[in-house]
Amino acid sequence: MAAAAAAGAGPEMVRGQVFDVGPRYTNLSYIGEGAYGMVCSAYDNVNKVRVAIKKISPFEHQTYCQRTLREIKILLRFRHENIIGINDIIRAPTIEQMKDVYIVQDLMETDLYKLLKTQHLSNDHICYFLYQILRGLKYIHSANVLHRDLKPSNLLLNTTCDLKICDFGLARVADPDHDHTGFLTEYVATRWYRAPEIMLNSKGYTKSIDIWSVGCILAEMLSNRPIFPGKHYLDQLNHILGILGSPSQEDLNCIINLKARNYLLSLPHKNKVPWNRLFPNADSKALDLLDKMLTFNPHKRIEVEQALAHPYLEQYYDPSDEPVAEAPFKFDMELDDLPKEKLKELIFEETARFQPGYRS
């Protein structure tokens, strides 16, 4: 048995990094590098399939601990075909020895970012990918969670065109009552997929910010290039207004922050660019849905259930096969304020269920 043979050999090395995942996981192969760890594929000697293993070493930084804990907490509670799951977590048996955490997930061949660099998508593919994104997002939003970092590289794909949403490190519980903030506070998610209200007066605590990101992703699938590639966040806003045109008086009224509102009023008037001029070969129904997702005013932006029911997705739409979460998700405490030592304890507890001999 390969596992037994490998057991005595000590941990495997990948590109100078220790990958201590034996004896169950062997035959490691490098896939890529994330912000705080390496991803490899490996052979799972129990289930007899290849899997992806992400090595995370977050414990030096409060922010990395926070993101790791958020991702683990959410993914262990979510169960959905269009959301990546966690199959196993490997870590040291004691908190003192725990320097790294290895997260085992289904192996997906590629992601939408890589695919769009090399392939022009047919309308059928665009429609099917968009449907799966929204089907996953319906479940996420039904749990009262916001992803807050939807972008092509966070959409995993395999050769049969199954799509899974990944990377919940920036996710939050929706909190519309605490959404208001000052003008242009730095926000962590990738700028190009950021809703305009985040640059203006919102913390991004409402579900509509994810819908905006999905609109940006749809536009990118239609043209193989990002629709709003801003260089900094004022530039980002200018890109958006350059296509959507100047906001109406009604849309300006929903911007509570006066500094932000006055900034918009100071800009020269811009007309909306028709979608069919930007995407002359696109399906007209796709452009109608795009228009409803890329709406400046978050209160008028389409919601995920309405988007699924849009005529563009008619061939796939089936509310009885678009499951929702059993209960809304709750973080027992706000993680932002906890020191990294406390976060490490919480990660240790959260991963205990995968330890040999675990009793809950």
Swiss-Prot record:
Residue ranges constituting the Protein kinase domain according to the UniProt record: 25-313
GO cellular component: caveola; centrosome; cytoplasm; focal adhesion; mitotic spindle; nucleus; plasma membrane
Modified residues (Phosphoserine): S29, S246, S248, S284
Primary role: Serine/threonine kinase which acts as an essential component of the MAP kinase signal transduction pathway. MAPK1/ERK2 and MAPK3/ERK1 are the 2 MAPKs which play an important role in the MAPK/ERK cascade. They participate also in a signaling cascade initiated by activated KIT and KITLG/SCF. Depending on the cellular context, the MAPK/ERK cascade mediates diverse biological functions such as cell growth, adhesion, survival and differentiation through the regulation of transcription, translation, cytoskeletal rearrangements.
Membership in a protein family: Belongs to the protein kinase superfamily. CMGC Ser/Thr protein kinase family. MAP kinase subfamily.
Modified residues (Phosphothreonine): T185, T190
Record: active site: D149
Regions annotated as coiled coil: none
Regulation of protein activity: Phosphorylated by MAP2K1/MEK1 and MAP2K2/MEK2 on Thr-185 and Tyr-187 in response to external stimuli like insulin or NGF. Both phosphorylations are required for activity. This phosphorylation causes dramatic conformational changes, which enable full activation and interaction of MAPK1/ERK2 with its substrates. Phosphorylation on Ser-29 by SGK1 results in its activation by enhancing its interaction with MAP2K1/MEK1 and MAP2K2/MEK2. Dephosphorylated and inactivated by DUSP1, DUSP3, DUSP6 and DUSP9. Inactivated by pyrimidylpyrrole inhibitors.
UniProt short sequence motif TXY, positions renumbered to this chain: 185-187
Modifications made to the protein after synthesis: Dually phosphorylated on Thr-185 and Tyr-187, which activates the enzyme. Phosphorylated upon FLT3 and KIT signaling. Phosphorylation on Ser-29 by SGK1 results in its activation by enhancing its interaction with MAP2K1/MEK1 and MAP2K2/MEK2. Phosphorylation at Ser-246 and Ser-248 as well as autophosphorylation at Thr-190 promote nuclear localization. Ligand-activated ALK induces tyrosine phosphorylation. Dephosphorylated by PTPRJ at Tyr-187. Dephosphorylated by DUSP1 and DUSP2 at Thr-185 and Tyr-187. ISGylated.
Name the UniProt record assigns to this protein: Mitogen-activated protein kinase 1
Residues where N-acetylalanine is found: A2
Listed InterPro entries: Kinase-like_dom_sf, MAP_kinase, MAP_kinase_CS, MAPK_ERK1/2, Prot_kinase_dom, Protein_kinase_ATP_BS, Ser/Thr_kinase_AS
UniProt cross-references to Pfam families, sorted A to Z: Pkinase (PF00069)
SUPFAM superfamilies the UniProt entry points to: Protein kinase-like (PK-like)
Domain notes: The TXY motif contains the threonine and tyrosine residues whose phosphorylation activates the MAP kinases.
